[in-house]
């Protein structure tokens, strides 16, 4: 925190979220550059200047000139900035990254200040940062629930909606106007441009705007859930200090969009067992209620997005499923509630009884077809799952080739270790091992059989995870305890993102 404040003075203007002066500070773009390389906001050396501040000022000045706006809107190839189209795109990207750094600052400071003096709570909630922590929650809660809503959160049809959401937090009109100018100059806020184009070219800024937009929606949604439930949910980092949220809440009550009495809305959705989980653009709303209650939630969410956030969502983007009959497609797994029957023989004196027990079990299965498709797209196998050589890596050193394949295999094994059925995971390992062997054999102009015979067991050890190596040293592979550990689901509390090959959404 002190290191961060060394670069940014928190004076009175900053306390009111005035960002415009920061746009002309060169170290802001150094932060953005360093974050792109090292995934770190702060620079080790603040004097290492990555960009030219003069070029940034020139570009911002031209953005305010009407002639330049006309040229940008018409997609003209003449009179490109600095005479080179790729340089213009470079500095547009540079300003985009700078904007993202600037707007992230107040929310980072807000989160840090709100957690000061709460070290014990931070330690307790540290493991919740892992996306794997969602699945133990499913195992604990979903066994007692009946229905689930699988929700695809709609994207805004216009980037202006994302910018307007910032007005509740950012009071600097100049910064907001400049952000709009930037989007117009880059031909992003136009009917002919898709929002997906912006998200690919300006990932960091788009992700911030979109996540902030979803945070605003979830703030009101969590409030409604709290009012309709006997149990109060716990607020975490993205729901802290909702000063402006309560202002919007008053507006929501005054409008009375769906009924004359706000309490009637809450009575319609009275449910003491309601659970909500979201990852990226997909969320799950699970309940112990009836099918009628879930249909009410479905159409309420559709009208809620449309009336208060200008988001058009079609009913088919929200699926209502019964947990006992359908599987959840979430975060690379098919999750379902399975019934396990067991017969127990009980002997009492001269009488014997057969007791049939049915136990619910939360089951997780790897989505093997999309994962094999991702491996085929990355040229590790064909569309049928048959391993092939990675020709683009054939010029690397042998150690680098083995290290790359081994790292991918370990990462996927680490993430999919929670699967209840390991057969699909073994298939993925087989594809990567044989693809690695064929790549090395192609490099040395040899056969796979001869190459594997030369390397022996040392080659296979590169594809083992650290946990598998430790277990193999402590327990024999054929022991009952070892088989139980290898076959059972294992959830890790240090996974903060999904591997690119596993993320096929």
Curated annotation (Swiss-Prot):
Domain of life of the native organism: Eukaryota
Question: What GO MF annotations does this protein's record show?
Answer: RNA binding
Which cell locations does it reside in? Plastid, Chloroplast
Keyword terms of this UniProt record: Chloroplast, mRNA processing, Plastid, RNA-binding, tRNA processing
GO biological process: one example:
mRNA processing
InterPro entries according to UniProt: Domain_X, Maturase_MatK, Maturase_MatK_N
**Where does this protein chiefly localize?**
plastid
Any Pfam family hit: Intron_maturas2
Query: So what family is this one in?
Result: Belongs to the intron maturase 2 family. MatK subfamily.
Its biological function? Answer: Usually encoded in the trnK tRNA gene intron. Probably assists in splicing its own and other chloroplast group II introns.
Give the protein name, as stated in the record.
Maturase K
Lineage, please?
Eukaryota, Viridiplantae, Streptophyta, Embryophyta, Tracheophyta
Q: Which gene encodes it?
A: matK
